Amino acid sequence: MSDMHEVRQALLTGERAEFQASGKRYIDTIFDDGESPLKHAHDIELKSSSFKWKYPLWYCSDILAKDCTWFEMARAGVWYTNTIRVEDCTFEAPKNFRRCHDVALRNVDFVNAEETLWACSNVSLENVSARGDYLAMNCSDIKAYNLRLVGNYPFDGARNIEITNSRLISKDCFWNCENVTVRDSFISGEYLAWNSRNVTFENCTIESLQGLCYVDN
């Protein structure tokens, strides 16, 4: 991607400021007021940049974001987007990542993870910290390593889940799920994995009131 057009230290405002952008690298750039600044963008790199308003990355593809921040009003930040890599970033806004495919998050902090990662597929989480309810609802094919979660009802309705070396402080975790494997992890919370199928825990510590009810395998 060396032939990318670079945008440095820009302050971008207004609705759809960079609509359908392609082959661009944004460095130290602020996406300020104005909805959907990168709607329908593809082949984009974002470095040390920030989003301050709603819907920044909708219907996008081939996105790389490093050292970026989604501030509190950058709600519903990444929806309907395919092939996105996010590293060393902070999300203050809720409801990020919905109906996305091929999502890789590494060293990411979700300050408010409420309703985040809904209906996404092919998801990789590495060194992710999240605080908020209803994480990863109805996701499929999700792998997490060193996930640190404080929040209730995660992974409701999800399938094909692998979690390793993680810590989940979560009530009603893994409800209505299918094909769940958790290894080398700590889970604390009531009513674990109700109404689920094919659930496996290996070398885990579990603290749960009325856990594993109505489980098939």
Residue map of PLM features:
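Long, distal/terminal scaffolding or interaction modules
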Residues: M1-N217
